[in-house]
Amino acid sequence: MDRRDFLKSTALATATAAATRLALGQEPVAAAPRTTDDDVTWDKAPCRFCGTGCHVQVGTRGGKVVAIAGDQKAEVNKGLLCVKGYHVGLALYGADRLTRPLLRKDGKLVPIAWDQALDIVVDRVLANPAGFAIYGSGQWTIPEGYAAQKLIKGGLANNQIDPNARLCMASAVTGFLSTYGVDEPAGCYDDLDRADVVVCWGNNPAEMHPVLFSRLVDRRARGDKLVLIDLTTRRTRTSAFADRTIFFQPQGDLAIANGIANLLLERGTWDRPFVEKFCNFRQTTDPLTLDGRPMTFDEYRQAMSAYTPARVAELAGVSPDDLSYLADLFGRRDLRITSLWCMGMNQHTQGTAINDLVHGVHLLSGHFGKPGDAPTSLTGQPSACGTVREVGTLAHGLPGGLVVTKAEHRTEAEGHWNLPPGRINPKPGYHTVEMWRRFSTPSDQGGDIDTIWVQVTNPARSLPNVDALFYPSRKLPGKFLIVSDVYPTATAMAADLVLPSAMWVEKNGMFGNSERRTQQWFKMVAPPGEARDDCWQTIAVARRLHDRGHPGMKDKDGKFLFNIVDETDRPVPVWDWRRYYDVNVDAQLFEEYRRFSRHKHKDLAPYAEYVKARGLRWPVVEQPDHTWRETKFRFVRGDDPYATKDDVQFYHSVTKDDRALIWFHPHQPPPEVPDRDYPMLLCTGRVIEHWHTGTITMRIPQLQRAMPQAYCEIHRADAAALGVADGEVVTIESRRGRVDLPVWLDGRGQPPPGQVFVPFFDESIVINLVTLENYDPLSKQPDYKKCAVRIRRRASP
């Protein structure tokens, strides 16, 4: 089976990816191959869905997107797309697009004018600037996130901004920071083409990142010898392709990583020269910090010695033979090993710890710094890296890896923004769970967030324990919810004010994908009705604040915070929607933002370079001939321009000595363990047809028909014990809430006895009523993978 066969066979790609025409209102949409119609105009864009960053060719005619094709010139996907990518053009054309601002009056949302809507937002800010927050997204474009970041941290100076990416990749961030002193993977997708072994740590790339996974399938089809290891808590499509599937108990991944390290040390197969030259050792402290406490090699060896194969079998349910097999692979110098992970490691109350430990296994074994030797996290949103991690739209962050808690970082940011000294607040804002907890708490009981502006996300369905974190605010006096979105999501329908937004190629944009690749596209079609760019909305609010005298909307020279100019350097009133596209606002915001990028050697090229390219991987450095060169492998001399001392140089190391940190973290139990009342463990996740809460994909007819409803996977033995048959509706209940949904036995995935899997794409089946909000103490990322539940047959109505 080659890559194309794999993609066609995965889920409904058999039926849809091969289709040549798809209905789109009165216009056809080509799903591939690319049409040759003379009147179709083509341009490039990254896909709107996951963090892979596939490139598509977008065909437009008569002001509509009418065709989509994989981009043959793109290194990421080489012309291939998954089933969502082939249908991405339909994302714009759901029947219920939001086209006018809406205000809640007498319990109903009624249309209002944009001027009134913007004035309402400004009134809320001025009434309590400290209590105004923005909740954003890894689906923001880079300029959108940068504008929101500058408004909150450079203008309002309250730092109350956080993204939904806190829920999906925050633990990956803290893992990279605590290991290397700087965020994001050192390797890139090229590692998948060079690895001899790929280890999937609790993720399912066959469905979640199918175009990347197809690289592995294609290599096998060409006769390459490739070993795929699936470390997992349930059987998935990835398991079907794996050479060895190793099942472990939820939260057992920490013990497995420690067990591998112990065997490497015990057998003497760790890479002594690499470790002695490039690594230091660290252990956790109380309270926890990203820096930890130094430990000697002997202390590290002693700590790891407790994780014998027998002990790991007890903690993780992994056999000694399986653990020995993993240690044998990592102990071999003649192999190149790439580890992949995603939500299974990140949505974890010990997410930072397990990220650290997997990095540590690679460092201890020397499987780092060569093509195919890489620990690589994958992201789920198209710009969780570019807009969240790089622009710094987290409660504590500033662009380019700066943080608000460091005086020198605040000074640098104030310099880039031309702000008066002291403008930036040194106190971090609230992380996502705390932000929504405060919003859902009465103002006189500590609920000091009274207005949240949600952009490009659906927290009414994506927050954990949503009945505690989201819905109480809807009944509290003084709380006000603003939502900018393209469709009437559950969040929008609960809002006090709804602002209709432009989407994807209805606006200019830039994304940053999982391999540090920054991507650019131009507006190709107009948004419907009165829908407008999120970036414009932010700038328009800032201008009205400026005009009403808010001092934070001016820099230290008295200029407007968003001073966009024409080619003669004259200000352009881009806050007036009629003038917004007189100039390229994205280009000017990006050029301002990229000044930050050199602080942690995340250098970005000029905007014009991204117009020409299918993305560039940072750091991107200008060459003597004035061309711009991207970096495939960070910290590696000969490829990374900042690695100059040795073959590998960790030039942002926590210990300031060019050494990475190998951590010891002890095994910890899950946040909830099964008991007599709640005897099973629930894990939530995604399916190939749908993306996140289904806002877009459930409005694409082909995808909705293929997977119309969420379901519950349980083992046949559990179904027999419960007396339920395939397709029968059951009730899943936790200490927090309950949902009813049908059982699917022997479907795509199969959990072991005692475990349950439910996808979260279905707005009508709110599985996050059941989940818990316990989070990692460092990353503040919640655990969606392990909560105790009970299942019973649904009572008759």
Which residues fall in each region the model found?
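Extended redox/cofactor-interaction regions of prokaryotic respiratory oxidoreductases
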Residues: 146-229, 254-258, 359-493, 502-509, ...
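N-terminal leader/propeptide and maturation segments of large enzyme subunits in energy/redox metabolism
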Residues: 105-111, 269-320, 525-647, 682, ...
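N-terminal export/assembly segments and adjacent metallocofactor-ligating motifs
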Residues: 1-269, 277, 281, 292, ...
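Catalytic or ion-translocation cores adjacent to nucleophile or general acid/base/metal-coordination motifs
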Residues: 503-524, 530, 750-753
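Short beta-alpha connecting loops at secondary-structure transitions
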Residues: 240-248, 517-528, 699
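Glycine-rich phosphate/diphosphate-binding loops that line cofactor/substrate pockets in enzymes
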Residues: 117-132, 188-196, 303, 324-338, ...
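Long, contiguous, secondary-structure-rich segments that constitute the structural scaffold
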Residues: 534-603, 677, 693, 697-713, ...
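Conserved short loop/turn motifs at secondary-structure junctions
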Residues: 135-141, 314-318, 342-349, 380-381, ...
